[in-house]
Amino acid sequence: TGTSCISPKQCTEPCRAKGCKHGKCMNRKCHCMLCL
């Protein structure tokens, strides 16, 4: 269910949309962290 990504910046918006403050890119997928 992760958004595909190349850089962590691409994960910021989709993660914020999920209520998360931070996202990083691993294995070309976004992993959201610091979620409510």
Curated annotation (Swiss-Prot):
Any one Gene Ontology cellular component term annotated for this protein: extracellular region
Record's keyword annotation contains ATP-binding: no
Keyword Nucleotide-binding: no
Cystine connections: C5-C25, C11-C30, C15-C32, C20-C35
Protein keywords: Disulfide bond, Ion channel impairing toxin, Neurotoxin, Potassium channel impairing toxin, Secreted, Toxin
Example of a GO MF term: ion channel inhibitor activity
Localization per record: Secreted
Tissue expression per record: Expressed by the venom gland.
Pfam family, one: Toxin_2
Main location, first listed in the record: secreted
Record function comment: Blocks Shaker B channels expressed in Sf9 cells, with a dissociation constant of 52 nM.
Recorded domain comment: Has the structural arrangement of an alpha-helix connected to antiparallel beta-sheets by disulfide bonds (CS-alpha/beta).
Protein family according to the UniProt entry: Belongs to the short scorpion toxin superfamily. Potassium channel inhibitor family. Alpha-KTx 06 subfamily.
UniProt name for this protein: Potassium channel toxin alpha-KTx 6.14
Organism annotation: Hoffmannihadrurus gertschi
